[in-house]
Amino acid sequence: FRRVLFRSNKNIKMKNKRKINNTLVYTISVLIIVVITLIAGIFPKAFGMYAQSVYDWITNWFGWLFLIIVFILDVFLIFLAFSRYGRFKLGSDEEKPEFSMLSWIGMLFSAGLGVGIVFWGVAEPLTHYLHSPFPGKIADHSEESARVAMGYTFFHWGISQWSIFAISGLIVAYFQFRKQRNGLISTAMEPVFGEAYKRPFRNIIDILAIIATVMGIATSIGLGIMQIGGGLNHLFDVPNNNFTKILITILMVAIFLGSSLTGLNHGVKWLSNLNILLGAILLIFILIFGDLKFILESYTLAISDYLQHFIEYSLRVNPYSGDDSWIQQWTVFYWAWVISWSPFIGGFVARVSRGRTIREFVVGVLIIPPLISFTWIAGFGGTAIKLALNHNDKLVHIVDKDYTVALFELLSHFPLSEVTSSLAIVLIFIFIVTSADSTTHIVAGMATGGSINPTLKHKVLWGLLIGAISVAMTIAGGLKSLQTASVITGLPFSIILLLMIFSLMRALKREPIHHFKMTSIDDEKDYSISLEEREKQDEQDNK
């Protein structure tokens, strides 16, 4: 009786302690977001200047670190996909995937970087054409700079970007669905630090994951708000001022909170499918009315250049000349942005990938979304470069001055421009809604101890905070403030991503090795122990 009573009291104490820690993580995370929002809203100019200084310092000193870590993630995931560990399911061995393949791909893409690719799909390749990624070596406004522009844009939206999402999503899905643990990043670090590692450290990791996720989505929403504002001004002469941005944000928050009420399976799935339809309509339109031969050839050549220069671009720094400004402005920003958003993608991708094998997960995430991005870039970005090569100075000057109107200015050169531009605005808006909707669900769960289905009040609170900080930073410093938010949170979280590799490998080695039996040679082996235990036995036998 005493033992039962002791265990009961111990369980009650553990539950109370867990509740206190969850409340601590929740409260501190909310306070940090509120403070940043207030500072950006009350002191926008000072915030913008400070953001610029911090961004320059971090990218100057730690740009190399972002490049190395992302390259390591690339190599590790490729190894994992084709290793024996790829057979494990993200769930029980008998479990079937929850979503169909088409719905799974659509949810990955639209909730991942849908708004980003629409924003940069025209602006980035055209900007690289105007301002060469290799200043002094390749002339601006040249055919060679056009070729490099497409290849480099493919690199920024290719495997490297999605490998960051994949590692975070993979480890969360593995622990949550195969090991029946919560979906917190701190829990996924247990194989590295041990299950009993100190609670303050766990709390710090969880708080950092929440802040990073909010900052990452704020960057994406901010880009979307800027582009919608630019599109409305370009089409209908709506003033592109702070008041317009606030109205766009209020409408967005109202819609994605309404979508959250329908639940993840209904709201996000329906909106994701609508995104695919609208995006496909615009892409087919540009393929029909654009130069299809040029688009297909530029796509093919860009794939070739991407594969040929993958390692060079992945680890490109200029220590001898000392000028890394272009790399810091583009590659480092992209990696930091994606890293800061990876806790969200980790949680969301884990949620929709239950029942799939590690191999299926890695191959799907590293191949399908990048190919979709490449197709969009070749269609819209390639068409923009074709117009620029034909000396369309109006498009060049407008995009060089304002990224936000790049897509709309391109569409204005084709029939039905008002219709297609309006569809583009709707597409961007829905991309924002799906991303914010999914993030609200994931962040609310992270802030409440890894809950898969957080309560409505928590989702409403985090939805309001995400909307507020997005518009506050957009107004305070525009693109630079948004970039700084990603870089600041992405730096410490990049170290956590690196540790996740060791965490996942240690966990996989503890799996029963009957999964690894491949030939009759293995018949005499004992499959009742884990691979880690088998290796220890082999070492003892060798001694």
Located regions from the model:
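N-terminal alpha-helical transmembrane segments of multi-pass membrane transport
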Residues: 11-145, 261, 284, 502-508, ...
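Membrane-embedded translocation segments of transport machinery
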Residues: 197, 201-356, 363, 368-421, ...
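Membrane-water interface regions at transmembrane-helix termini and the short interhelical loops
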Residues: 15-19, 44-58, 77-96, 149-156, ...
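Helix-loop-helix module between adjacent transmembrane segments
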Residues: 17-20, 24-27, 31-41, 74-79, ...
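Long, low-complexity, intrinsically disordered cytosolic termini of multi-pass membrane proteins
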Residues: 518-543
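Short, small-residue-biased leader/transition segments that mark boundaries at the very start
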Residues: 1-5
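Flexible loop linkers connecting adjacent transmembrane helices
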Residues: 15-16, 49-55, 82-101, 126-151, ...
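Membrane-interface alpha-helices at helix entry/exit sites of multi-pass transporters
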Residues: 64, 101, 139-149, 197-207, ...
